[in-house]
Amino acid sequence: MIKKKSHSGLKKRIKISKNKKILRGHAYKNHLAASKTTKQNRQLRGLTMVHKSDVKRIKIMLNNL
């Protein structure tokens, strides 16, 4: 039987919290920040929880974690 592998790209993009919640970073913050408002840049900081409709798919992709 083939050994199952975790999705390498996804492992780099998410973090699993102490309470087993899946966290992700916000989009639209890598560059061109000067054209965005200060409020917009501030709200893009930090991590947010993955939507509950995506959790099942992510857990399948991360079967080894």
Swiss-Prot record:
The keyword Transport does not apply. Keywords: Ribonucleoprotein, Ribosomal protein. GO terms for biological process: translation. GO terms for cellular component: cytosolic large ribosomal subunit. PROSITE patterns: RIBOSOMAL_L35. One of its GO terms (molecular function) is structural constituent of ribosome. Transmembrane segments: none annotated. Gene3D superfamilies: 4.10.410.60. Pfam families: Ribosomal_L35p. HAMAP family: Ribosomal_bL35. Belongs to the bacterial ribosomal protein bL35 family. This is Large ribosomal subunit protein bL35. It comes from Phytoplasma mali (strain AT).
